[in-house]
A protein has these predicted regions:
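Receiver (REC) domain active-site loop signature in two-component systems and cognate sites
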Residues: 9
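C-terminal output helix
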Residues: 60-69, 73, 81
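Terminal helix-turn-helix DNA-binding modules in bacterial transcription factors
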Residues: 148-187
Length: 193
């Protein structure tokens, strides 16, 4: 997904649209390109400060616009492919989990999701529906947001956090497999065999 908007629009200005998108938890991850005839440094900085990913001044070369679009989408795809796998060696590196967090609101969202999972990690009944309820979001909105930021479905993300905690506990060597399974919400120790 990508939004391209002129700043001078009849219903809502493009910079207002950008600000609304970037301040909404459901849309803050979507890249925004602003097109405008406003070409002074103050306007450009203002557009970038509200969260625009690109600010292109008119008149512009359509090839440059296409290249910017391609670069934004390619970079997001590269990040998804790089961080989409379950890397068990970086259990303490939470920044890698949010591949598409360009706004503070996105980092806070991921931190809140992670906190809710970690607070309930020993509960085998922690499901996507329970997590959605804890986050105060509909299942669809939650799925779309988490998938866009982490390239993980919510169920897979819960499992990822549980597995990372399990790996950490296994490395400590102070608990049995059965204890670790219980401590991380797995109903059966067979997940570790």
């Amino acid at each position: 997904n990508l939004v391209i908007s002129d700043i001078m629009m009849p219903e809502m200005r493009g910079d207002e649209l950008c600000k609304a998108l970037k301040n909404n938890i459901e849309t803050s991850h979507i890249p925004v390109i602003l097109l405008t005839a406003l070409n002074n440094d103050k306007d450009i900085l203002s557009g970038l400060e509200i969260g625009a990913d690109e600010y292109i001044v008119k008149p512009f070369n359509i090839g440059i616009l296409k290249a910017n679009i391609s670069n934004l989408l390619t970079n997001r795809a590269l990040l998804r492919s790089k961080y989409g796998s379950l890397d068990m060696d970086d259990e303490d590196d939470h920044e890698d989990e949010c591949i598409n967090c360009s706004q503070d609101i996105d980092w806070k969202f991921i931190a809140n999701v992670r906190k809710n999972i970690e607070d309930n990690i020993d509960n085998p009944a922690l499901t996507v529906d329970v997590l959605c309820n804890l986050m105060g979001m509909s299942r669809t909105s939650f799925y779309n947001k988490l998938r866009a930021l982490t390239d993980q479905a919510p169920g897979d993300y819960i499992r990822l956090i549980r597995l990372k905690r399990s790996v950490k506990l296994l490395k400590e060597g102070t608990h049995s497999i059965t204890e670790i399974a219980e401590m991380t919400g797995f109903s059966d120790a067979k997940y570790f065999r």
